């Protein structure tokens, strides 16, 4: 798990929420509590992605990063898999709750997609230079786009849609 990268995600989402969305939108859909759950879900899924990546990279890391590897050195693969599932399930419970609160349950599918994509990347896409890098770039962008979806879209009704889009 890369704590600095996780902190960057938190900072970017907080900056977008409090310095952009809350200033531009009269009333956003996410309360501070639901925003906390949203950010925590994003961080937990990202941390889970790091764990599954380390699990699949264990053999390569034995050679390339023997001193810094964690799986089967500091943490067994079995325990790492437990944490992978625990983090992702916890994140999904949180984001499903937030999706229900904002009455957009289908938004939670984006987080299911992110979990699947991180697993797919770790399993076999990271060896494909272009596809792997494009997927990771897309998932990073999606972590920012998601905030707009969850915080702005639920507050836009059909009458105000054209005003919001073209302002």
Regions found by a protein language model. Give the residues of each.
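Multi-pass alpha-helical membrane architecture of UbiA-family
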Residues: 1-167
């Amino acid at each position: 798990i890369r704590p600095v990268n996780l902190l960057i995600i938190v900072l970017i989402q907080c900056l977008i929420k409090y310095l952009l969305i809350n200033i531009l939108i009269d009333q956003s859909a996410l309360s501070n509590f639901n925003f906390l759950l949203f950010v925590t879900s994003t961080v937990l899924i990202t941390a889970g992605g790091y764990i599954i990546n380390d699990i699949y990279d264990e053999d390569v890391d034995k050679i390339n990063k023997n001193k810094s590897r964690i799986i089967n050195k500091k943490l067994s693969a079995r325990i790492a898999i437990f944490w992978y599932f625990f983090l992702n399930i916890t994140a999904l419970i949180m984001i499903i709750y937030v999706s229900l609160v904002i009455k957009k349950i289908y938004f939670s599918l984006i987080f299911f997609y992110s979990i699947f994509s991180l697993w797919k990347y770790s399993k076999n896409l990271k060896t494909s230079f272009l596809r792997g890098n494009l997927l990771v770039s897309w998932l990073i962008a999606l972590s920012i786009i998601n905030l707009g979806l969850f915080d702005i879209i639920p507050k836009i009704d059909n009458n105000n849609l054209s005003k919001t889009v073209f302002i």
